[in-house]
Structures are given as structure tokens and as C-alpha cells.
Amino acid sequence: MGGIRNPFLFRATEQNNEDDLFIQLFSEDILNILKNEITEIFVKPLILRSSPGFGKTSLLKLFTAQILRKLISYQSAHSDKNDLLKAVKSLNFIDEENKIRKVGLYIPCTNLYSNIEDVIEDEKGKNILFFALLNSRIIFEFIQTLKFILKEQNKNFNEELVEISIEDISKLPLNLKENYEKNYLSLKDFYNYAISVEKEILKYIDNFGLVDYDNSIKLSNLELYSFNLLSNSNIKYQGKNFSLDFVIMFDDLHKLTTLQRDLIYKTILNDRYNISIWITERLSILRDNSIFHGTTNNRDYINIHLEDAIRGKTNKKIFSNFLSNITKYRMNFGSNNIASFESKLSTIFEAQDIEDAIRHLQKELNIYSESIKYKQLIEEINNFCEYNFGTLLKILAISIYIERNRLNKQQTFDFVEIEKSETEESLSTLKPSAEYFSMIKCKLAYYYSFEKITRLASYNTEQFLSIASKLYEEMIARSIINKEEPLSPDLQEKIIEEYANNKWNEIATNIINGREIQTFLSKLLKYSYKESIRVNAPYVPGVTGFGITSSELKKLQDDKYYIKLKEILMSCISYNLLTIDEDRKQGSKKSETVTIFYFNRWLCVKYKLPLGYGGWKRKRISDLNDSIKQDELTKQFEILQ
């Protein structure tokens, strides 16, 4: 295909149907998350959770037959994707002879399933219809996958379908078993049965339950019999074991009703099927997870919080490297003469702005020049002769250090001089706060550079692409009029601030209870700003979230008094306004675990907060509940509207 005007606007890979482009834009770095669990993810249910926009759907679709076959065909023509092929091979989906050995059966959890609960009142009837439809969809996807693979092997689908049989039919619905006297069924029998079941259920839903459905469905077992059918040992081809392993992949499980979601989890965790099962769903700390009681993560299932995994405990650059690769792949498809995205983002300030800021700080800090204690520090500040950003950060760090020392109740006497060597370690730890204070005290740009944009993404690929697309538009505009210089820090920040303001305005129009959510977040963000700009920078680099203890979270779950707060928090998580860092401890090992709710980084832009993690304040549920209360003026304004 031809070049794309703005490759960052070519939205999330799950939305495009071009296999070539899907592969070209896919970054293999994300597969390391699965590789770390390679011994478990095919023998235990795998649950992948994240905020919306992470790329869960794209991850699952990579392992479908069509994409795997296309990836294999790339090995000679597209050497730049050999790393992706190697990564997929390391997960055993493709062998060293480039044959598909495992394949994903992609099952999206659409609204069709939840519609079942709208047309039938009986709970058992709901469950039977739900499982009947789910089984038919799984079988249909299985056969469509086989059809594609057989076609690729130049085999006749209809002829081969009769040759593939299911040996053990003991778990089948009674009515299906009774239709056949032979001790096995061909896939053609299952194919016809699956189609007939789906037609009956769709007719029932389309007629709002006013017509009856086939009695054979009513006699169905309340089981996911398709799981048993598709185990490798149960499928025979011309009497021999089948050469493919299947991974059933449920995408967006959160779109099901609570009853349906719980039913799937209970069935999978209790029945221990002999087939690989992967599930993706949105992260929600406030969902009732009692269905997992009696089971243990890593023993009965594998639960991966994707943001946690890519955040990197030992390598903090995992996510930024991941985004750097995505950027490189996207830039290859641009139709403009912009060679490098990162090089078009300047990190250099106007020399005069830096010099003015340094001279202003030197003058401001001279009030401590008469103090013996700070003599060496002030002399160092006044002796700086290089007017650059590094010098400015050193002066700001010294300024913060002096304020900390002044406010410390256990400070040394004023006549005891602080040695320069005593301050060096402290000053190095204050660099993030110094950089933040360059915006607060010196009015310099803070939200700029590729490194900052990766942090603004909040570990969310979709968000990164949105921000990058805005900056790229400016690059295009400048290239048209032959302006070759990169975007200045000020211009980058202006574009990013416009993005944040637009996102903020969308809350009121795009989310139910949007104004209440804005009120709730606004109060917390203003409080965080007030804490972050304290002259002694007690939280490095600032406060960008709040923490709730496990006992307080239990109140939120159990006490109906807080139902409104619970709804607002769940909306904030669902719409990626808050991200979660679970089960953290503060203090001793015996202390209560804390769940930290971090503001999405674009909210930090809106309220002039730093972009670091780690700075948060503990909040009681009662305090948070007060934050959702609007003042009378706001209420009257909404009534007038």
C-alpha cells in the first residue's frame, strides 16, 4: 500500500483488516511478557488484564492462523520482521521448520451474549442459551481456522472435513449424541450442528423471546463441551492424532454480563479442561472477584497485569523501548519526508531564557549568602559560569535542599557550615524535582521530548499514538513550508496541553456522570498540585496519585453508603482516567497493603503536575466521598443548563 499521511493516526492495529500492515506495525517487545511465563501459559488458564488501549486485542490476533501464515511468508521478503517471527517461535506457535504448531481461536465477547439476559428471565435458561451460543461460536471458529489452514495446504476443505473426527463424545449434549449411532462424529456433523444452534438462538433474540427455540437446545448440558472436543488427543485426522494444538482466546470478557463472566471463570477454574485458554479483560480493582476464592494465582491460573509487566521492575526502559520500536515501524509508512520522529522533538531551550532563569535564582538565593551554614552552596551557585539547562537544574536542586534543611526540625546549628560533600548525594536524588520546578519557578516548558511523551502515555499504546499524531501533524505542516528545524520545547508543550484540555472536556460529554467525575478528579488534582509545589519538594518529584488501604477498599465494596463513589471510581478506571498499582506496602512487612490510584498522565498535564510515579497520599474512603460532592453554585449551573 502507499504511504500514510499520518501513520500515528492509523488507529490501533485491531481495527485494521490488512494483515501486512498489522504485522508491519506490531512490535515484538510485548511478547517478552508471555515468554517469561512460557512454562505455564499453555497448561493453566491465562488472564491478561489492562486498562483500555493497551493492545490486548492485537496481542491475541497475532496468534490467529491468518496472521501466523502471513508472518511465515515474511521470513525472506521482510527481514526486518525476523525478530517478530523469532519471538513467536519462542512461544511455540511456529516450529523451526516454519510450520504452525499452535493456533489461536479468537472469540470476541460481543454484546450479542449479553442480549440473552434481556430476553429470558429464568437463570438456568439464560446460562443454557449462553453456553449453547458460546459452544457454537467456538466450534465455528475452529472449523473456519481449519478451512484456512487446509486451503493454504492446497487441500479440499469439504473432503478433508469428513476425514477429521472427534473420538470422545461423552461430554456432548445428549441430543447430539443420540443423533448418531457411530462412536465418533466427523467435523461436518459438528459444523452443521453449530450453525443450526446459532440460527435458533439468533432468531429467539431477534424476536425478543416471543418465539420458542429448538427443544434440542433446552436439553443441552450446562457445559463448555467444545473445550473437551478440541483437546489435541481428542481430534483425529485419518485415525491419527491431529498435528495442531489450539488456544481458545476470549477477548474483552468484561463486555459480558456479571453472571456470564462469573460462569465462564467458575467453569474454567473448576473443570480443568485439557486445552489452553487465554482471556483478556479490562482491569478493575472494584469488581467482585469472589469467584476466585479457593484458587491461587500461579497455582490454578496465571494472572498478568500488563501495565505492571511492561513497567519493568529491573529494566525501567522496557516500555520506552517498546514505544520507540512502534514509532520506528510507523514512520516507515509515512508519506512525508520526515525521517525520524524523535529527532524532530527538540530538547534545547532558548539560551536567553536559561540565562535569565539562572540569574533570577542566583539573586533569589543570595539572601542566604550571610549564613555560614549555606556559604559553600551559595558560593557554588554564584561561581557557575555556564548558562545551560544542567546548571539551572543544579541550582534548583540546591534551592530545594536549602529549603529542606531550613524546615528540618533536627537541622544543624546555623554557625556549622554544610560541606559540599555532604550534599552531593542528596542533590542527585532531587534532580526530578528540580526539573519539575523549572516549570513551576522558572516558567520553562516541562512536557516535551520523546522521553516525556512515553511517560505521558501512561503505559498505554493507544494514548501514545494519539499524542504522537498531534505532534506529527505539526511536523507535516512545517515540512510543507520547508521549515526543517525541530519542534521547540514550548511548541511541544502547547500541543500536548491542547490535547489534555480536549480530553478533559470530553469527560463531561462522553462519560455518564462526567461532570461528577470532573468534580471528583479536580479536587484531588488541585490538592496534589498544592502538595507538589511545596518549596522543600517533600515528594520527589511530586504527588500524582492517592492510595487506599485494603480495609478501606473493603468498606467501598461492602457499604452501600459509598455506592456513588464506587461507581465514579469504576468509571475512572474503565475510561483510563486512573491507573492502578495493586498490593503495595508502605512501611513494615506487616503493614496493610495499599492500592495506589495514579492519575493518567494527561491529567497531570492539565493540572501542571510532574510525570513521575511513587509520590502519592493515602486517602480514607470518607475523604474521597467528600470529593464527589459538588458545591451549590455548580449544581445550580447544571440545573440552568
Locate the predicted segments by residue.
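Sensor-1/coupling segment of RecA-like P-loop NTPase cores
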Residues: K255, L269-T295
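Walker A (P-loop) phosphate-binding loop of P-loop NTPases
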Residues: G53
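Conserved P-loop NTPase "ATPase switch" module shared by AAA+ and STAND
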Residues: Y237-T258
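Conserved lysine of the Walker
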Residues: K56
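C-terminal leucine-rich, beta-strand-based interaction scaffolds used for sensing/assembly
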Residues: C109-T110, K373-Q641
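P-loop NTPase nucleotide-binding core
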Residues: K61-N234, N297-I400, N405
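Phosphate-binding P-loop
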Residues: K35-V43, N241
